A protein has these predicted regions:
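Peripheral, non-transmembrane regulatory/ligand-interaction domains of membrane transport proteins
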Residues: 1-244, 249-251, 257-260, 264-269, ...
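Short polybasic/polar patches that bind polyanions
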Residues: 84, 316, 353
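Membrane-interface, cytosolic juxtamembrane amphipathic helix immediately N-terminal to a transmembrane helix
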Residues: 266-305
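Juxtamembrane transmembrane-helix termini
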Residues: 287, 322-325, 354
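Bilayer-spanning, highly hydrophobic alpha-helical transmembrane segments
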Residues: 293-326, 335-345
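Membrane-helix cytosolic exit motif
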Residues: 348-355
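Conserved small/polar residues in nucleotide/adenosyl-binding loops
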Residues: 356-363
Length: 363
């Protein structure tokens, strides 16, 4: 095991114990950076915040919505200070620093913590999973991501275009856009896996196609849809809890947006169920195709061995070279032997063809 993998695993185990100090237990090495976006109906501006300026209560403007984007979780001390400054417990910092933590929604007085995992396909068409946490208050939103990938680029575009009058609304609508980005990635990933599995099914149904690596592809995409299901199913359960919160963040006028997000989550879960059924049928189909190919190979081997059994017998008899073998002294004995073997092979071949033709007619 490589050293960094051992370190991540050791830190992950350490985070499972009660402590006053926790570590980032993921694999990303992104340095912790903070970007602050402040907006209201009249203005919108973004700036970088130094990692030492983690007193967000002083940086926040009460007349604007303050969105702090924390990218990179390697500076665990800074993350812990941010959480404490937000009025939460050390254990909440542990949840933020521990990737693949169970999805949860925790409601506090006037604030809320959402811990979840997102997955998406990168530029190399490989599925990636990222641990994301969101702290929300009336006029403050703090997002924590493992890397500096533009996970919430769609939310920034919505702010620039003032989509759905987002700059006029409170932090609840910004939270809806953030969750929409995460759920949209789940929808896109689930739909892509389903499409790939359907393409594999078409390949397996056509015996002319090369099916050499189909087994590994089925296993790979089975693992991918399991990741999606693992991230979406708990989120749907916690989403109902999110809609029942009474901290005033999710106001009645934006509740339909959250209901739509819940419908999208239901679509993701239904798609993963479809992927599960397709994968199960693909495994059966792949095994069946392997059996058919094995039967075809055995059939060819049987034909070859049947052809050579009588020829081997004749060659074995004439190869004994006993003194009393009249055909050895015949003038044309060699040519007669060849003629007998060729005739035997041809007759055997005709018999095999006739036999398989009659079997096919019976079927």
């Amino acid at each position: 095991m490589r050293r960094n993998e051992y370190t991540h695993r050791r830190r992950h185990i350490s985070n499972r114990h009660l402590s006053d100090k926790y570590y980032y237990a993921g694999e990303h090495e992104t340095a912790t950076g903070i970007r602050l976006t402040q907006y209201n109906e009249q203005s919108l501006h973004t700036k970088e915040v130094r990692i030492t300026d983690t007193s967000f209560s002083k940086l926040s403007d009460p007349d604007q919505i303050n969105w702090f984007e924390v990218s990179g979780l390697t500076n665990a001390d800074a993350i812990t200070r941010i959480v404490k400054d937000f009025g939460l417990h050390n254990l909440d910092a542990k949840d933020i620093l521990t990737p693949q933590h169970v999805v949860k929604v925790e409601e506090y007085k006037g604030r809320m913590l959402i811990v979840l995992n997102s997955c998406y396909y990168d530029v190399n068409n490989e599925m990636r999973s990222e641990h994301i946490s969101i702290l929300v208050a009336n006029n403050t939103v703090i997002t924590f991501t493992e890397s500096n990938n533009p996970v919430f680029e769609a939310a920034h575009k919505a702010l620039l275009s003032n989509m759905l009058n987002i700059r006029k609304k409170g932090s609840g609508l910004l939270l809806a856009f953030l969750l929409n980005t995460i759920i949209a990635n789940l929808v896109e990933s689930a739909s892509k896996v389903e499409e790939i599995l359907e393409d594999i099914e078409e390949t397996l149904l056509d015996p002319k196609n090369d099916q050499g690596n189909m087994g590994s592809l089925i296993q790979q995409h089975r693992h991918e849809y399991m990741i999606i299901r693992k991230n979406s199913l708990p989120l749907k359960d916690q989403f109902s809890k999110l809609l029942r919160t009474e901290n005033g963040i999710i106001t009645p006028d934006i509740l339909p947006i959250y209901n739509d997000l819940q419908d999208q989550l239901q679509f993701v879960i239904q798609t993963t169920e479809s992927c599960r059924e397709i994968t199960s049928s693909l495994v059966d189909l792949y095994i069946s195709n392997n059996d058919l190919r094995m039967n075809a190979i055995m059939k060819r081997l049987t034909i070859v061995s049947t052809l050579f059994i009588p020829l081997t017998f004749l060659v074995g008899v004439w190869g004994m070279n006993f003194k009393i073998m009249p055909e050895l002294d015949w003038r044309y004995g060699y040519f007669i032997a060849w003629a007998v073997m060729i005739a035997t092979g041809v007759l055997t071949w005709l018999y095999i063809c006739l036999l398989y033709t009659s079997d096919a007619a019976d079927d």
